[in-house]
């Protein structure tokens, strides 16, 4: 059975996560406030960040940087800035 939540990112009701995807207090907030659709958007941005900035998830500093970008993207309305990336024109 799916959960419906008010998604902070999308600013509308949407299907919530099936389980907590991220540890700690940030994870609880994501579970309660971020929809599957918004999380999928973040996953695309996260992949781009890891690849373009050559982040190593074994490195604590790189993980902290990624977590900071995630919080800014999901909760503060900031888009992820990736140097040299130009989105495809529609």
Swiss-Prot record:
It holds the Pfam family Iron_traffic. One of its GO terms (cellular component) is cytosol. GO terms for molecular function: iron ion binding. It comes from the Bacteria. Keywords: Iron. SUPFAM superfamilies: YggX-like. The keyword Transmembrane helix does not apply. One of its GO terms (biological process) is cellular response to oxidative stress. Monomer. Belongs to the Fe(2+)-trafficking protein family. Could be a mediator in iron transactions between iron acquisition and iron-requiring processes, such as synthesis and/or repair of Fe-S clusters in biosynthetic enzymes. PANTHER family: FE(2+)-TRAFFICKING PROTEIN-RELATED. This is Probable Fe(2+)-trafficking protein. It comes from Serratia proteamaculans (strain 568).
């Amino acid at each position: 059975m799916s959960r419906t939540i008010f998604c902070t990112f999308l600013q509308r009701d949407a299907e919530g996560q099936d389980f907590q995807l991220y540890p700690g207090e940030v994870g609880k907030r994501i579970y309660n406030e971020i929809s599957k659709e918004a999380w999928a958007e973040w996953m695309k941005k996260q992949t781009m960040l890891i690849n373009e900035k050559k982040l190593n998830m074994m490195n604590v500093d790189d993980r902290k940087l990624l977590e900071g970008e995630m919080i800014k993207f999901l909760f503060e309305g900031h888009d992820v800035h990736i140097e040299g990336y130009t989105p495809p024109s529609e």
